[in-house]
């Protein structure tokens, strides 16, 4: 079964709520990543030099927004096209950056957990449910698979 219109709607609806306080959501997202996997700190150039998560770091905010937006766009594409379609240049770049940063499969799960918890907190318990969690989870998983495939291509090209 493909990604449904309802799933797409759930992702879009919660994205609208998330967008209302991007600075807080971005900070929370990275706080959760480091809470789940403290060692991940060194994978982010904008966190390496800092003892704590920088409150007003534009790179941190920009990175979090990219993750949120790309996952939301993945949901829309999954319903419309049945797959995640990311521009080749963007995907190639994402693959290269993730390889250079030393990203492995388990890291994608850490980001997924942090993403889902950030969204849950942002929209509140009364709106968060299993359907919404599954919709965001599926959209993220498909995006992660596209990035992993490109990482493999990068490994194959440089091997």
From Swiss-Prot:
Record-marked site positions (Homodimerization): 133
Pfam families (alphabetical): Globin
Cellular component GO terms held in the UniProt record: cytoplasm; nucleus
EC number per UniProt: 1.7.2.-
Alphabetically ordered keywords of this record: Cytoplasm, Heme, Iron, Metal-binding, Nucleus, Oxidoreductase
CDD domains per the UniProt record, alphabetical: class1-2_nsHbs_Lbs
GO MF annotation, one: oxygen binding
Entry binding sites for heme b: 45, 59, 63, 98
Motif Homodimerization per UniProt: ranges: 35-39, 105-117
InterPro entries: Globin, Globin-like_sf, Globin/Proto, Leghaemoglobin-like, Leghaemoglobin_Fe_BS
Subcellular location: Cytoplasm; Nucleus
Name of the protein in its database record: Anaerobic nitrite reductase HB2
The species this protein was found in: Gossypium hirsutum
Classification lineage: Eukaryota, Viridiplantae, Streptophyta, Embryophyta, Tracheophyta
